Curated annotation (Swiss-Prot):
Location relative to the cell: Cell membrane
Membrane topology: Multi-pass membrane protein
TM stretches of this protein: 31-51, 52-72, 92-112, 123-145, 152-172, 179-199, 225-245, 247-267, 280-300
Catalytic activity: heme b + (2E,6E)-farnesyl diphosphate + H2O = Fe(II)-heme o + diphosphate
Superkingdom per UniProt: Bacteria
Molecular function in Gene Ontology: protoheme IX farnesyltransferase activity
Annotated protein name in UniProt: Protoheme IX farnesyltransferase
The encoding gene: ctaB
Primary location group: membrane
Biological role stated in the UniProt entry: Converts protoheme IX and farnesyl diphosphate to heme O.
Amino acid sequence: MNSLTKSINLDKVSYPQSTVKDYILLMKPRVMSLVVFTGFSGMWLAPNSLHPFISVIALICIAIGAGSAGAINMWYDRDIDALMKRTQKRPIVRGAIEADEALSFGLIMAFFSVFFMALCVNFLSALLLLFTIFYYICIYTMWLKRSSIQNIVIGGAAGALPPVIGYASVSGSVSLDSVILFLIIFIWTPPHSWALALFCNDDYKNCKVPMMPVIKGALYTKKQILIYSVLLFLTSLKPFFVGMSNIIYLVIAAVLGLVFLYYSISLFYDNADNKQAKRFFAYSIFYLFFIFLLLDFCRV
């Protein structure tokens, strides 16, 4: 039996009563935490001073916008989520929330996040938030994810936009500084996601999602991870050279980047199992959080 034909008819199952926890999980809280954190960094690194009320509203809107995109993503991907071990416990798959209910929830949150961003903050940040939600749902989830080996590379732009939104919410503009923040996340996303794809390769293959390890194999993927790791190392040093951060940032960012490179090289030469891919994946999360934390504390 074809793996896709084995997926559960999630629209016809009997659903138990939903809980608050189910709706929180529907919004992908781990992704939300990264989005909010990088969004705050964009706000903090903007040239203007932070307005307490507007800053809080902006962060809430960014969080709700990210949550809405996560909810609609789970609605659309419920068929393949049911087939993947990593996603089989998501709320729609296990019957905690109906598919139509999840879609309505996501759309309502998306509307209010953009509406209040425009009403209380500024139109530029609202437009950027709207574009980010649209890009993640329509360009990545509905189009690229299931059709292109470059799904993560191109689709990663959505995850890289929160600091730009945060920056625009304070400054009312987009500048070189915010573009550099975007580039750090944009270049970080492929190696991070491909490491996950390496140790979840069977799941992606089973669902016919054209992740790079599925189409090109592990060795080619590891080469790409190494290339992107070098690019990330170079990009992560740019904040110092454009006057965004001080020498402390440069030194620590260089060390973190070298460790990132070490893990990518170790992954490239690892032929045993997926342990090195899991180590690389775990470190990549730590790396991004710490780089943005450094930017916050070492700004000029």
